[in-house]
Amino acid sequence: MTKASVAIVGSGNISTDLLYKLQRSEWLEPRWMIGIDPESEGLARARTMGLETSAEGVGWLLNQPEKPDLVFEATSAHVHRDSAPRYEAAGIRAVDLTPAAVGPAVVPPANLREHLGAPNVNMITCGGQATIPIVYAVSRVVDVPYAEIVASVASVSAGPGTRANIDEFTKTTSRGIETIGGAQRGKAIIILNPADPPMIMRDTIFCAIPEDADRAAITDSIHRVVADIQQYVPGYRLLNEPQFDDPSVVSGGQATVTTFVEVEGAGDFLPPYAGNLDIMTAAATKVGEEIAQKLLSVEA
């Protein structure tokens, strides 16, 4: 079966976990991993898996006689902003796992098919991938004037990049709650949980809804979205049934539905408690596979 060729730019933990997922894909063939540290564990693992590797950066990749069909980049926002126009000029589709947001933001259950033709798509944030689908599930049934999410992740799973970009995380996720989730106004909060042993990712999604909303339809919509996510993140699950509350002073006089989810990672390279990182690499793989299917069908 023909597969789309893939390069991974970045050789850190997320890139390495992504590599394991891509190796299992029926549609994607990882061929290259590019970094800047010749001693990185990611490059070493990639070499043992038969990939061509380089520590000379994106310039090396673009100078190769054969170019990948897709590139997955997990570096930093400023690096991807510099590289994105070079990928597009070379005819390489890009899946961006940084906060750069050069291309449209994508959440697979909500809006992936709208952007399969985009030269560059952005994976938003881990909190966004875990919670925006739930807001979307509610908003496709009723109007959602306000949605708020709280993402709690193991402190040890949050690297220096995450810690340095907490404000960017909240702003990007809040924007996604509105533009993709469908809420009129969105808010995001992230909590770094210092518990030891580490806790897996847990998220609370609060949506304001009309008082006369069809609660059964909302619950059904949430369950269908959860099933969609479980196709690529098996460890994604509801902690209990969605909880509905009548209007009260606490909720600003609005009825609400609150959903609790947890995300356990697959344990490919990252530990299972790092579901916040796992959902990013799993969602990116899903996006890449859908893009590859479209590319290969056009070529056929």
UniProtKB/Swiss-Prot annotation:
EC number from the UniProt entry: 1.2.1.10
GO terms of biological process kind: catabolic process
Keywords: Aromatic hydrocarbons catabolism, NAD, Oxidoreductase
Swiss-Prot/TrEMBL catalytic activity: acetaldehyde + NAD(+) + CoA = acetyl-CoA + NADH + H(+)
Transmembrane segments: none
InterPro entries assigned to the protein according to its UniProt record, in alphabetical order: Acetaldehyde_dehydrogenase (IPR003361), Acetylaldehyde_DH_C (IPR015426), NAD(P)-bd_dom_sf (IPR036291), Semialdehyde_DH_NAD-bd (IPR000534)
One GO molecular-function entry: NAD binding
Enzyme class: oxidoreductase
Binding site for NAD(+): 11-14, 157-165, 276
Active site: 126
Classification via HAMAP family: Ac_ald_DH_ac
Entry similarity comment: Belongs to the acetaldehyde dehydrogenase family.
Name of the protein in its database record: Acetaldehyde dehydrogenase 3
Source species: Rhodococcus opacus (strain B4)
